[in-house]
From Swiss-Prot:
Function recorded in the entry: Secreted effector that interacts with and inhibits host apoplastic pathogenesis-related papain-like cysteine proteases. Inhibition of host proteases by a pathogen extracellular protease inhibitor forms a specific type of defense-counterdefense mechanism between plants and microbial pathogens.
Assigned keywords, A-Z: Glycoprotein, Protease inhibitor, Secreted, Signal, Thiol protease inhibitor, Virulence
InterPro entries: Cystatin_dom (IPR000010), Cystatin_sf (IPR046350)
Location in or out of the cell: Secreted
Organism domain of life: Eukaryota
Stated name of the protein: Cystatin-like cysteine protease inhibitor EPIC3
The encoding gene: EPIC3
Induction comment: Expressed during infection of host plant and in germinating cysts.
Keyword Secreted: yes
Disulfide bonds: none
Similarity remark: Belongs to the cystatin family.
Example of a GO cellular component annotation carried by this entry: extracellular region
Origin species: Phytophthora infestans
Amino acid sequence: MAFTRSIALFAGLALAASSAQEATILGGYTQKNATSDDIELLTQATSSANMYNKNVDTRICLIAIENLETQTVAGTNYKFQVAGCPVETDDELGACDDRNCDYSSYNIVIFSQPWSDTIEVTSITPAEYQG
């Protein structure tokens, strides 16, 4: 009888664990509502060319945040989907001065590790259309 209860308990735990895995993919991105701290991080990171990884050669100014997802790693990856416009110089980074520019959607990934004082723009790519 105790053996049967143990099997039933184990099966129940396995079922609960598989349901929880479906809800949250470990290591995957999770949808998040942008807070004022998230917006400040985005603005700080994208306004200074010194915070861009050397492999990031796309430069844009920002018009609006369209979406945010986060991923916990050895810190946090923030994947912002933004409306923005391509710019020619680092002086134009940050918020767009010309709000009537020909904007597109971009994904900006920013890595943040507060305990080591690390903030880095790791990629800027055109966003895929989600229609």
